[in-house]
Amino acid sequence: MTATLPYPANVFVQMLQALDHILDTARTSPSGPPGARIVHARLAPDMFDLSQHVELTCRHALEAEARLAGRPDAVSIDLEGETLEALQALIRRTIDRLRDRAPGEATRTFGSDVEVHTTTGQLFRMSGNEMLDDWAFPQFYFHLVTAYAILRNNGVGLGIRDYLGHMRRHLVSGEDASGGARAES
């Protein structure tokens, strides 16, 4: 359960679980799985493909946690294959790493300076809070939503309920995310 994890690990985990569900929906689609080509699908020729967006979603979650713990650049991502199952395995390993790391991280540097070194050679210096608000969360959500959009663009039947499935736990009345009436408790 993500509620027992400290912030921001709880946010990353619940949205990574949504991404895992989204990929599972693609893999088990009633019209059949989209096939191996889907992991290389893009929204535009100059954009990353699905596998790169999933990898970057995982990377930004792990890097944010590492920076807050005072361990910048302590992240390695190993994608083991080019299938939806391999992408799901990467997501699940990332979730496990966030869960394993989070309880023991007593020292958080929300107010202290952290650095972000980009692959293009840029260096950004900001507080931990600024890093989350201005870098980590925007990057994380951009890549997650783009992965969702690639699947939608390739005919996978997804909707907002797949993306916000975690909101079911807050539903008080009306229909649950599966479309059925929610029983009052």
Q: Locations of the language-model features?
A:
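Long amphipathic alpha-helical coiled-coil segments
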Residues: 70-82, 153-159
